[in-house]
Curated annotation (Swiss-Prot):
Enzyme Commission (EC) number: 2.1.1.192
Misc. comment: Reaction proceeds by a ping-pong mechanism involving intermediate methylation of a conserved cysteine residue.
Lineage, uppermost ranks: Bacteria, Bacillati, Bacillota, Bacilli, Lactobacillales
Keywords (A to Z) from UniProt: 4Fe-4S, Cytoplasm, Disulfide bond, Iron, Iron-sulfur, Metal-binding, Methyltransferase, rRNA processing, S-adenosyl-L-methionine, Transferase, tRNA processing
Protein name per UniProt: Probable dual-specificity RNA methyltransferase RlmN
Length: 359
């Protein structure tokens, strides 16, 4: 299976071309075709010789993804189900915001983190996506904009789809360099957010990268007992280890950390738990932010339900009274398969039923 050329950073593409007897400017031309003109085949690169186009075709594909399902919400949110070359399925979501167009990308096929409320982990991790497969998600959403011819562009990226980004660290970092490159898509680092469930050692590595990309941490509980019961990752990286790494990140980068907190009715949404959360973040209050997230119910996790609005607001009020920077997140795509991993899970179930029916 040929890798996608999207897997290469600009420097790597230059090195690859020079090794094959080409001048550096040839790689720059190819890069422009990929990320500025956004062609979908090497044959469209009209200033590249046929011989070198043949070498490109022998070495790479362009976009490795095939579109399987598209769901569009009344609010303009678009959810894509893409098929990988090996037949595996992944999800990507386009969210229209007042500040621009944000795309949520997937980094793994399945997830091993094992959060008990999440649809992503219904199917265990089967493999990591390579950086080209992650970048290809952005390119196909941008193609959707290009085809509309309204001058729209992907302006923001959130690495919050299926999988744990820091469990696929090398490929995610390569992806970030590709989409942030000023000579390509030029998506600003401060418009990119990477979310982790709390791999403390990788948070430290990320701090040392020196990038301006935003960090979000999926917290979802204010104490170890509850967090370990709903997020298995907490057994390896309890809150003490996690917050030590977060404090290191803040000290090293002087950048704010966002905490994501899904509101689960009568599980993590009490007044007492709001106070615990306020106390937990007290020492980093100036450089932290809490995002309260309405829960999208998942049929396979019917032990959980969405917190009523009055409980969310009461929780929010406690945080605000304690000086915590916080917001209740705006919902997107509530009339489609909104929960992360939900569309993929449903489609795989339908595919299995079709196979069974033909036997």
């Amino acid at each position: 299976m040929k890798p996608s050329i999207y897997s290469l950073t600009r420097d790597e593409l230059i090195a690859w071309a020079v090794e094959r007897g080409q001048k550096q400017f040839r790689a720059t031309q190819i890069w422009d075709w990929l990320y500025k003109k956004r062609v979908q085949s090497f044959e469209e690169m009209t200033n590249i010789s046929k011989d070198f186009v043949s070498i490109l075709n022998d070495s790479f594909c362009v976009n490795p993804l095939k579109q399987r399902v598209v769901q569009e919400s009344a609010d303009g949110t678009v959810k894509y189900l893409f098929e990988l070359p090996d037949g595996m399925l992944i999800e990507t979501v386009l969210m229209r915001q007042h500040y621009g167009h944000s795309v949520c990308v997937t980094t793994q096929v399945g997830c091993n983190i094992g959060c008990t409320f999440c649809a992503s982990g219904l199917i265990k991790k089967q493999r990591d996506l390579n950086s080209g497969e992650i970048t290809a998600q952005i390119m196909l959403v941008q193609k959707y904009f290009d085809d509309r011819k309204q001058g729209e562009r992907v302006s923001h990226v959130v690495v919050m789809g299926i999988g744990e980004p820091f469990d696929n660290y090398k490929n995610v970092m390569c992806f970030l360099r590709v989409i942030n490159d000023d000579n390509g898509l030029a998506i600003g680092a401060r418009h990119i957010t990477v979310s982790t469930s709390g791999l403390a050692h990788k948070i430290r590595d990320f701090a040392n990268e020196g990038v301006q990309v935003n960090l979000a941490v999926s917290l979802h509980a204010p104490n170890n007992d509850l967090r370990s019961s709903i997020m298995r990752v907490n057994r390896s990286f309890p809150l003490e280890k996690l917050f030590s790494a977060i404090e290191y990140y803040i000290e090293k980068t002087n950048r704010r950390v966002t905490f994501e907190y899904i509101m689960l009715n009568e599980v993590n949404d009490s007044i007492k738990q709001a106070q615990e959360l306020a106390d937990l973040t007290k020492t980093i209050r100036k450089l932290s932010y809490v995002n309260l997230i309405p829960y999208n119910p998942v049929s396979e996790h019917d032990q959980y339900s969405r917190s009523p609005k009055e409980r969310v607001l009461a929780f929010y009020d406690v945080l605000k009274k304690n000086g915590v920077n916080c917001v209740v997140r705006q919902e997107h795509g509530t009339d489609i398969d909104a929960a992360c991993g939900q569309l993929r899970s449903k489609t795989m179930k339908k595919d299995r039923e079709k196979v069974t029916a033909t036997k």
